[in-house]
Swiss-Prot record:
Keywords: Ribonucleoprotein, Ribosomal protein, RNA-binding, rRNA-binding, tRNA-binding
Similarity annotation: Belongs to the universal ribosomal protein uS7 family.
The protein's name: Small ribosomal subunit protein uS7A/uS7B
Biological role stated in the UniProt entry: One of the primary rRNA binding proteins, it binds directly to 16S rRNA where it nucleates assembly of the head domain of the 30S subunit. Is located at the subunit interface close to the decoding center, probably blocks exit of the E-site tRNA.
Family annotation (NCBIfam families): rpsG_bact
Organism from which the protein derives: Bartonella bacilliformis (strain ATCC 35685 / KC583 / Herrer 020/F12,63)
Molecular-function annotations in GO: rRNA binding; structural constituent of ribosome; tRNA binding
Keyword DNA-binding among UniProt keywords: no
Length: 156
């Protein structure tokens, strides 16, 4: 793998319904085998269900859910003199968003409702209210970083 050039970030077009780039990223993460229309149906369907349940702006609730799931600090492995330490480091903003999206989708897929639309809408509402599996994942990551605070001077 060449270290000469850093890959440049691709520009992502906003989604057609809400005009939001983050929703497009979320759709792309949900998509399997390039089936964008299926992913669109799932995301838009889930946001419609959320709007029906909570009676608030679904895009605002979606962003609130992402913010509640995004980690501020995480641990990374660092080898020092034969020992491997879990060193807490701050999470870059782009990685925060990517992790939040990934954890939300994984949590939604792990739920036991029948349709993905229902699972995703349920997880979004839970995450917006600081409940659910995705928020628990963030809490676990933060707890791990807190437990390893003693090694924070190994930061690089």
């Amino acid at each position: 793998m060449s270290r000469r050039h850093r890959a440049e970030k691709r520009e992502i077009n906003p989604d057609p319904k809400f005009g939001d780039v983050v929703i497009t990223k979320f759709m792309n993460a949900i998509m399997f085998d390039g089936k964008k229309s299926v992913a669109e149906r799932i995301v838009y369907g889930a946001l419609d269900v959320v709007e029906g349940k909570v009676k608030t702006d679904p895009v605002a609730l979606f962003h609130q859910a992402l913010e509640n799931v995004a980690p501020h600090i995480e641990v990374r492995s660092r080898r020092v003199g034969g020992a491997t330490y879990q060193v807490p480091v701050d999470v870059r903003p782009d990685r925060r968003q990517a992790l939040a999206i990934r954890w939300l989708i994984k949590a939604a897929r792990g739920r036991n409702e029948t349709a993905m639309i229902d699972r995703l809408s349920g997880e979004l509402v839970d995450a917006a209210n600081n409940r659910g599996t995705a928020v628990k994942k963030r809490e676990d990551v933060h707890r791990m970083a807190e437990a390893n605070r003693a090694f924070s001077h190994y930061r690089w």
